[in-house]
């Protein structure tokens, strides 16, 4: 799968990032997302595969493109027999976020990117559109920190794993009212907090790389993005745990059902009998082979954002593989018309 699709998925996120970056700073978050969706879908439909969106832009009735259950790839066409040999057919599940951090793009802020994860059919958890409590940490802490422990306990363990004092640790938390007590506990324990407005996928992945000055992600965010983060951390060997949040009193946003009991019933209808289950990265991204790809839209911790020059653009992307145990940073110059010059830096 990696040798066949590795380069292709880089081009998918690159095209989405370039399209979205053209709307950077214009205050139009919906447009920035829409053009990324269109570009990502167009490029995926040029790939020799039969792909199924398991995490996308929403349910079929709510999303015109890249909706959950949509099939993409050349081998989904009506005339697919002319192009696809059944014996060589690659069937994959796909999780996408064409513009992770739409507000960041709209207001010209750092940290947005186009992301996707793929695995063989059945290899990615089809997360409901709920919230998820998340804990991400570096490979050294894998299996040692635990989402059921307090932040104070986890920070002590994390410090020991990284041979740092708690005061030297930086924890990323989304700046939301629901995290007021968590933020205070982290500070009381002695660690430092980096608050972000959006984009916790980037924060989770950054835990897997030394030198980012991000040592953990804690708190509650969207469940679909949790699966994408888990896929990346599975490839990196980092620690990731997620637990679905079904109690509206916890998030206080009105974006999930109004009743706790109703949400539990909805999860049961989706085949989730234990709503309190804690999922590991290997359970959220359980496939034999998992690939993750991201391309910076605006500058971030790991990648530069899209830079335009006359006649083209320059992108920085990341592709991580569970199969080859590699993380490749890809610097690409896109020549779209005869340029006056090529941007080298």
From Swiss-Prot:
Coiled coil: none annotated. GO terms for biological process: fructose 1,6-bisphosphate metabolic process; gluconeogenesis; glycerol metabolic process; reductive pentose-phosphate cycle. Its EC number is 3.1.3.11, 3.1.3.37. GO terms for molecular function: fructose 1,6-bisphosphate 1-phosphatase activity; metal ion binding; sedoheptulose-bisphosphatase activity. GO terms for cellular component: cytosol. Keywords: Calvin cycle, Carbohydrate metabolism, Hydrolase, Manganese, Metal-binding. Mn(2+) 2 binds at residues 97, 100, 225. Substrate binds at residues 100-102, 131, 176-178, 198-200. It catalyses: beta-D-fructose 1,6-bisphosphate + H2O = beta-D-fructose 6-phosphate + phosphate; D-sedoheptulose 1,7-bisphosphate + H2O = D-sedoheptulose 7-phosphate + phosphate. Pathway: Carbohydrate biosynthesis; Calvin cycle. InterPro entries: FBPase_class-2/SBPase. The keyword Hydrolase applies. Mn(2+) 1 binds at residues 33, 57. Pfam families: FBPase_glpX. CDD domains: FBPase_glpX (cd01516). The keyword Hydrolase applies. Its cofactor is Mn(2+). Homotetramer. NCBIfam families: glpX. Belongs to the FBPase class 2 family. Catalyzes the hydrolysis of fructose 1,6-bisphosphate (Fru 1,6-P2) and sedoheptulose 1,7-bisphosphate (Sed 1,7-P2) to fructose 6-phosphate and sedoheptulose 7-phosphate, respectively. This is D-fructose 1,6-bisphosphatase class 2/sedoheptulose 1,7-bisphosphatase. The lineage of its organism: Bacteria, Bacillati, Cyanobacteriota, Cyanophyceae, Oscillatoriophycideae.
């Amino acid at each position: 799968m990696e040798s066949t699709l590795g380069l292709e998925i880089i081009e998918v996120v690159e095209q989405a990032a370039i399209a979205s970056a053209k709307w950077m700073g214009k205050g139009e978050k919906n447009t920035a997302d829409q053009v990324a969706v269109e570009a990502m879908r167009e490029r995926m439909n040029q790939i020799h595969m039969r792909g199924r969106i398991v995490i996308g832009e929403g349910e079929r009735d709510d999303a015109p493109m890249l909706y959950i259950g949509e099939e993409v790839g050349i081998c989904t066409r009506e005339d697919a027999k002319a192009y696809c040999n059944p014996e060589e057919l690659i069937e994959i599940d796909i999780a996408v976020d064409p513009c992770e951090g739409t507000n960041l793009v709209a207001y010209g802020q750092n940290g947005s990117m186009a992301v996707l994860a793929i695995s063989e059919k059945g290899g990615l958890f089809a997360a409901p559109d709920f919230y998820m409590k998340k804990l991400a940490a570096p490979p050294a802490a894998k299996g040692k920190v635990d989402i059921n422990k307090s932040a104070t306990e986890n920070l002590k363990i994390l410090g020991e794993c990284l041979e740092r004092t708690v005061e030297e640790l930086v924890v990323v938390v989304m700046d939301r009212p629901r995290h007021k007590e968590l933020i205070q506990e982290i500070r009381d324990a002695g660690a430092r907090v980096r608050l972000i407005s959006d984009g916790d996928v980037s924060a989770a992945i950054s835990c897997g790389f030394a030198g980012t000055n991000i040592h953990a992600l804690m708190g509650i965010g969207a469940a679909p993005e949790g699966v994408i983060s888990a896929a990346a951390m599975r490839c990196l060997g980092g620690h990731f745990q997620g637990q679905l949040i079904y109690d509206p009193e916890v998030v206080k946003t009105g974006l999930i059902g109004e009743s706790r009991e109703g949400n539990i019933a909805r999860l049961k209808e989706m085949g989730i009998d234990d709503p309190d289950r804690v999922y590991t990265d290997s359970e959220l991204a359980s496939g034999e082979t998992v690939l993750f790809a991201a391309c910076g839209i605006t500058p971030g911790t790991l990648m530069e954002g899209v830079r335009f020059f006359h006649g083209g653009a320059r992108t920085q992307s990341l592709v991580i593989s569970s199969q080859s145990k590699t993380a490749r940073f890809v610097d690409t110059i896109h020549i779209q018309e005869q340029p006056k010059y090529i941007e080298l830096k």
